[in-house]
Design a protein with these regions (language model features):
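Polytopic transmembrane helical bundles with strong interfacial aromatic enrichment
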Residues: 1-282
Length: 282
């Protein structure tokens, strides 16, 4: 779902269909298998529908079979987030300038940013629920306060970077690196709000990266935490650099989004494990 949605944004195909939830009034609209913009948007809608049904099934199964109250509540929250996600996506389409007219497109962009950010939260919560059914969760040892603090700081920093990235992508604010200058990787060209969002996203990514590494190096079971987080962080930073030096390649930006979601969800799962470790509940 993230790949399909990210690719749709990368090629600016979010309004390939002006209606919602159907696409041109159909679940099998003409041209969606042959026209790339229609394929991107309609495949995103189909995949999102499948994920939504899966999340509702997860919530129902936890209601029927899960004895731990905290995990059940997380499953219910997942169902709520996925329903909200569908609504945000629909409003992004229905309130677009192409549908309601007007001089600006602020309403649609706000819902698009919310849709992008909520997608990350949905996947992260799904990862936490999955982690709650692992052996590591059941065998968790008490965590130190500094470890829990490091987890919160890392998760908050990464989520902040995600918000700036969503604002950049949905407004098409990305400042490309065309001069070959290393400085331009960290100090984007331009001015105004686009420049500010690029600066916050890039500098924030460096701060978040350090926070992730600090958390990865704390506490017990360091290898199981350090290896996936460090690997995902390294790949994500590399993709971030490629994203701004290859402006004509939508696939790199899409993969950057997907790996970012993998990093955030993995981080949230480990953070939940740390907070689970301080209590015998859930």
């Amino acid at each position: 779902v993230l790949q399909a949605g990210g690719f749709t944004t990368s090629i600016r195909a979010g309004m390939a269909f002006l209606d919602w939830p159907l696409s041109n009034g159909s679940i099998n609209p003409p041209g969606w298998l042959t026209e790339i913009d229609k394929f991107a948007e309609h495949s995103h809608r189909l995949a999102a529908t499948g994920l939504g049904l899966l999340c509702l099934a997860i919530a129902a199964l936890h209601y029927a079979r899960e004895p731990r109250r905290g995990v059940r509540l997380a499953a219910y929250a997942l169902a709520g987030l996925v329903i909200l996600q569908g609504g945000l996506g629909g409003l992004r389409v229905l309130l677009d300038q192409l549908n309601i007219g007007g001089d600006g497109n602020l309403k649609a962009i706000c819902f698009a940013v919310g849709h992008a950010v909520n997608a990350q939260l949905t996947i992260a919560l799904l990862a936490v629920i999955a982690a709650s059914h692992t052996l590591a969760w059941r065998q968790a040892n008490p965590a130190q306060p500094r470890e829990r603090l490091a987890a919160k700081i890392a998760a908050g920093a990464v989520f902040t970077v995600i918000i700036f990235g969503a604002i950049m992508r949905q407004n098409h604010f990305t400042s490309w690196v065309t001069s070959g200058s290393l400085t331009e990787l960290f100090l984007p060209a331009g001015d105004g709000l686009p420049w500010l969002m690029n600066l916050f996203h890039r500098s924030g990514a460096l701060v978040a990266g350090v926070a992730v590494l600090i958390f990865a190096a704390t506490g017990e079971r360091r290898a199981s935490r350090w290896v996936p987080l460090a690997l995902l962080l390294g790949v994500q930073i590399s993709l971030g650099v490629l994203s701004i030096v290859l402006p004509l390649n939508p696939h790199v930006r899409t993969i950057h989004l997907v790996v970012g979601a993998a990093l955030f969800s993995t981080l949230c799962a480990h953070a939940a494990l740390v907070h689970r470790a301080k209590s015998s509940e859930a």
